[in-house]
Amino acid sequence: MNNLELGGAERVIAILSDYLAHQNCDVSIIVLNRLHNQQALNSNIKIIPLNQNKVLRSFFPLRSLLRKNKYDFIIGNMWPITILGLAASLLSLRKSNVLFIEHSIISNEYNHQSVAFQRIVKLSIRLLYNFSSQIICVSNGVKNDLEKLGVKKSKLKVILNPVDIHSELSDHDEYDQHSLNWKDFTGIKILSVGNLRINKNYPNLFKALRVLRDKYNQNFISLIAGDGPEKESLRALITEYSLEDHVILLGGVQDTESLYRNADLFVLSSDYEGFGMVLVEALGYGKTIVATDCESGPREILGNSEHGYLCSVDNPERLAESIYKAYLNKLSPDILLQRYKDFDISLIGKKYLSLMQEMKSD
């Protein structure tokens, strides 16, 4: 992986690695660089930093590492790390099963880059992804996208992202330093969690919150846990929309439990997702969810509004209306928790183990 920072894909790898380690697998996580603000991991898992800031510069250290160590499986997460892992494995002259886990809709992920860069991404996928042993897609939307990009259907398998129910759910309900912003507040407590990137479309959320305030006369505090390149532009929008008393950017938050527990609603305003891990986390706390019906993930997780409120993408009026309706008509926490259990690592992990055993026996 690139690193083990506080992101959805990184969280998935931490959970999966922990599960495999408990199944007596010898697990190492190779990262380009080690960050201080990273996922907590099982002490039996080896973290091997390549101490490189660029993917291309990581090729030779990675190839050298793979030559010195025999791995049964090399699992690459997300382009371009997938390509790096495949190339280093092939040229290490060691025989390993190369498994990719693709977490995003690649056709959308790089659409803000230059046309030339987008062509390079798509060409590399069409030419190289079919050389992998297998590609795990975290949603049907990711699978469909890779098919369109030229990956053979036989190479693709959908396994939804896992959560670790036993480690993530506890009985604590106190307010921490972040959720203190809600303590004694009587309005709507809205939570969003995710990196501050373009695809999360927080401007859509801010516009919806303005409608919620001006049209529906609601008082609320919206806490956003996450960091990223759009932080300064989002701060400017908060001021422009006069939302300083309503929206708080918390930055990266290591432990979001208190935030989830004390929220009234969880809101996702994205233009697209690969899966939407935060939606599953919100289900685990029995929180009513409002999410844009973007590709892909929200509908696969929430169904046709059985487990959350879905609204059209980039439509502030509809998003505001859904937030208002969801607050007045919250879903049963018991039903949401039951859906959450469908993503337990004890179920999802078995699918990974079964696949790996099949690949090893071929």
What is each model feature region?
Residues T288-T292:
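Short hydrophobic beta-strand element within catalytic cores of glycosyltransferases
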Residues M1-L56, D145-E147, K157, P229:
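N-terminal strand-loop element at the rim of the active site
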Residues G252, D271:
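Aromatic "clamp/platform" in nucleotide-sugar-dependent glycosyltransferases that forms part
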Residues P49, G303-P316, Y324-K330:
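Conserved acidic donor-binding segment of nucleotide-sugar-dependent glycosyltransferases
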Residues G7-I15, I188-V211, P229-A236:
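A conserved mid-protein helix/loop that constitutes part of the nucleotide-sugar donor-binding site
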Residues R63, A116-I135:
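Membrane-proximal helix-turn-helix segments that form the acceptor-binding/catalytic region
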Residues N130-L156, V163-S167:
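A short, active-site helix/loop in glycosyltransferases that binds the activated sugar's phosphate group
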Residues G76-L84, E102-I105:
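Short His-centered aromatic/hydrophobic patch
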